[in-house]
Structure formats: structure tokens, C-alpha cells
């Protein structure tokens, strides 16, 4: 089913293609909250929205919020979405962490089915707004 506004989210820890090592939701969250966006490398909607996503990340930072991208696609189905290709994309100047949900457990828990999908989580870990299934 996934998270709806008012739901408390569960944490996660995933490998970060933009800076190495694992990163958790707690690492991203601030006392104000965070934006979590499910995205990938191959999706034309994501590719066409990269500038807007980067602007959203900059605005989140300006407001004191965390921002993180999560790729949950199966690299066996979409080779462009492999961790190595995520690293290559991040190296081109991605201004936020880009995490790999290889098992798709996080996407399943959050209810993310398409890309991009955005969740605004407040400082208490409660979904304030979700922009999902827009395509």
C-alpha cells in the first residue's frame, strides 16, 4: 500500500552512489524534515525533470531540509540503473545523496511504483505530502 500523508515512515539504510558508504534516513533527516524522491537513470520522466529535481534539492537545503534520491529499479531489467551507472550519473554533479534500493524493499514499504515520486517528511518522520503515481 505505501505511505500516505499522516503516516510515520520507517527508517532505511542503503548504499550511496554519490559519496560512497551507506546512508540512512536518519542521516538525511533534519529537525525540519526531508524530501525523499524515488528516481532512476533510465526513466524519461526523470531525465526530463533533472533540472527541476535539482532545484527542489536546492530549495530543500535552503529551508534546512534533507533531500535524498532512491533508485529501486532492477538492474537486470534496466542496466542503465545499475549501481555503477548511478555512480557515473552522480559524478556529473548530482547535488544530493543517491541511494540504491537493490532489494526494492524500501520502495515497496513506501509504495513507490513509478518515477519520479516525491515524499515530504516532517521532522517527526511523518509524511506531510506525497506526489505519487502522477504519470
Model regions: which residues?
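N-terminal "domain-start" segment that seeds a small globular fold
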Residues: 1-26
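Short loop/turn microsegments at loop-to-beta-strand junctions
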Residues: 9-10, 34, 115-117
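Short active-site neighborhood of thiol/selenol oxidoreductases, capturing the structured segment around
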Residues: 28-44
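Short, thiol/selenol-centered motifs that function as redox-active sites or metal-ligating centers
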Residues: 40-51, 118
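Structural microenvironment flanking redox-active thiols in thiol-disulfide oxidoreductases
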Residues: 48-91, 106
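Short, internal strand/loop/helix patches
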Residues: 87-115, 119-121
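Short, glycine-anchored, charge-dense loop/turn motifs used at functional sites
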Residues: 118-130
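Conserved small/polar residues in nucleotide/adenosyl-binding loops
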Residues: 132-135
Amino acid at each position: 500500500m505505501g505511505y500516505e500523508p499522516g503516516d510515520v515512515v520507517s527508517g532505511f539504510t542503503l548504499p550511496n552512489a554519490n559519496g560512497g558508504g551507506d546512508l540512512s534516513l536518519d542521516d538525511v533527516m533534519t529537525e525540519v524534515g526531508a524530501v525523499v524522491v524515488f528516481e532512476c537513470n533510465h526513466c524519461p520522466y526523470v531525465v526530463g525533470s533533472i533540472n527541476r529535481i535539482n532545484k527542489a534539492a536546492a530549495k530543500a537545503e535552503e529551508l534546512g531540509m534533507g533531500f535524498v534520491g532512491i533508485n529501486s529499479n532492477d538492474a537486470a531489467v534496466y542496466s542503465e540503473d545499475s549501481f555503477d551507472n548511478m555512480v557515473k550519473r552522480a559524478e556529473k554533479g548530482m547535488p544530493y545523496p543517491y541511494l540504491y534500493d537493490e532489494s526494492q524493499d524500501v520502495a515497496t514499504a513506501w509504495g513507490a511504483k513509478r518515477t519520479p515520486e516525491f515524499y515530504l517528511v516532517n521532522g517527526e518522520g511523518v509524511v506531510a505530502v506525497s506526489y505519487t503515481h502522477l504519470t
